[in-house]
């Protein structure tokens, strides 16, 4: 941990050495004890009892953000623009669970602060996409993510790629 001054010093030193810094950002969810839950309770998906929820059973320790809220979009974009003053790009955790249109708007606005910023999406596997969609949730494919991101993990096409290189149909 450290201060913003410490982080600025770190990124300045990274840049002095001819390197770039990509920041990992998590915009699909927060921890259940995030100050955002207390200060912006309407920004989260909730069950009938009002409890924060996630569509992924294995992720019981998170609270999914609700991108149906315009104020959330601007808050998230403002934080990206703030970080873009110091970093050269973003690795976006669980990017497919955040609407591609959000990423498109975020990229447009960040470009004003950091032209040429690098955008890396952690994508998901095909079975995960199918599961989330079967639960009524949003989950983009790699091809949709490539509309906005420079680089993706390509999880959803990996099995097809392996079959191809191994000479299988």
What are the functions of these language-model segments?
Residues 1-84, 106-112, 129-130, 152:
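Substrate-binding/active-site clefts of carbohydrate-active enzymes
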Residues 15, 88, 93-169:
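Active-site-proximal helices and loops of the catalytic beta/alpha 8
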